[in-house]
Amino acid sequence: MEFNELKGFLGDRFTTSKAIRIEHSHDESWHVPQNIPDAITYPENTNEVSKIISFAYKKNIPVIPFGTGTALEGHTHALKGGITINSSNMNQVIELNNADMDCRVQAGITRKELNNYIKDTGLFFPVDPGADASLGGMCATRASGTNTVRYGTISCLLYTSPSPRDR
């Protein structure tokens, strides 16, 4: 498969290394991977994600999201190869509104990273699925955990609002 366009704008944040592709071919589920992705990308913002998805759409290549790999659902498996989008470089808090008790974050930020960022505000992010999952992964799996009875699941705490300012 030809990936020059992706290599062009991602540089060293694009790889076809077999070892890294194997690492991204599974999560913590019991499912045994039958295939591996063709390429792994590490975008840093939604514009880059959009370019990767546009490229994949034009070439009819499957896209597989990957957070920290701690999911139990098997959704990171590359059933037909494809391009994995690893969100680990998208780990920033974009905006924190202490008065409103909310924030805007990128999908790759982990629960621990977010809680470390907001710890001095008196706020905390209560969803604790047991692993240090990314918030994007938590949203994808509708995560819950040990604090669910008191604070609810990720679905109870989540509001998404895609807009040009998010890019």
Regions from the PLM with identified roles:
Residues 113, 131-133, 138-158:
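Hydrophobic, small-residue-rich alpha-helical packing segments that form membrane-like cores
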Residues 67-69, 130:
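Short, ordered loop/turn segments at secondary-structure junctions
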Residues 77-90, 96-135:
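Anion-binding (especially nucleotide phosphate/pyrophosphate-binding) glycine-rich loop
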Residues 159-166:
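Conserved small/polar residues in nucleotide/adenosyl-binding loops
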Residues 4, 8-12, 58-61, 116-123, ...:
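Generic secondary-structure signature for well-ordered alpha-helical cores
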